[in-house]
């Protein structure tokens, strides 16, 4: 038991950011701020930019970086480092699906990490946790609507379709 948290989430400041303390090459604790100004402006429900921002900042807190060399603001035409840089591929991207003219996708906010995020997290943590893709569901797994994942296997994956009305692709 400890009196300090590994992950501290607050709304003290008006901006959205994450900061991590690193010790011996590992994150020892992180602070995430998504200010009340942010949630007042973008809402707090599922499918809002606020929820996507919280996911993005948690991504930083657990070791993920942006998809390019940008921070604070960016333009796809001048800052994207690869052709698929958009929310469609990663919650860590700064670019909506409609900002990236190279992808065919509808504008939508993300409800979960995207494909690139899962791959990066697997790369960072699978050797330490045993939760990597090599230990994930095998076979013809259906995620979301009409999932074949039972609640006993993963209540989180089982419940995703209850919270989303539109996909981010």
Spans of model-derived segments:
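RTX-like calcium-binding, glycine/aspartate-rich low-complexity repeat tracts
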Residues: 1-169
